[in-house]
Amino acid sequence: QVVDAFSNYSEELLMNGEVDLALVMLPFHSGTIRYEPLYREQIYLAVPKHSDVCQKLGGSESRELETEDLRKLQEEPFILYERGRRMYESSQKLCRSAGFVPKAAFLSNSCESLNAMVGNGMGIGFVPSSVEKTANHEEIVYYSINSPDAIRTLAVGYLEKNLSAAAQGFVKMAKKQNRITG
């Protein structure tokens, strides 16, 4: 059985023994789950191209932001992820490290809808680089962020007890394919 679910729910299914494996953005909240990282991606700040925020950050050319740059945005309306999403946790952590709590203009349940709202000028928000790579949105400038908190890792999680042969094979393949270091 394959279940498509957000990370927190996937972790819950794994802990309850309802699934053998869970693809989850780290961190796992349970210390009993073993995991293999699959890939890492950056988290970008998405900003409407023709906004005052874009000008405040130096124009419509993508560049790397420092924590001090994020601090300039503390009064701006953010489009945030709903609580319980790993991107919610990442967004909050990035803003806290810049010394503020973001002001929510809207809440979103998906990276794609958050990105679309930014493209329609409804606010600014954080998106994973995979969204930037697949989005066809000329109205958004994506800024990378120079922070260890601006990286997220997808991992396959599992409980070692009673792991099926198919699940063991998947974990073995994940270990072999893992090119993440450090």
Give names to the regions the model predicted:
Residues Q1-G31, L107-S108:
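Central regulatory/effector-binding core of bacterial HTH transcription factors
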Residues Q1-V2, R96-A105:
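A local structural motif
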Residues E11, M15, Y35, L70, ...:
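Short hydrophobic/charged patches on amphipathic alpha-helices used for structural packing
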Residues L14-V24, I43, F100, V118-I124, ...:
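Alpha-to-beta junction loops
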Residues S30-F78:
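Flexible hinge/capping segments at coil-to-helix
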Residues S30-P37, E41, E112-K161:
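Beta-alpha-beta core module
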Residues Q55-S62, I151-G182:
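Extended ligand-binding regions for polar small-molecule ligands
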Residues E61-L70, Q74-A98, S164-G169, T181:
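Secondary-structure junction motif
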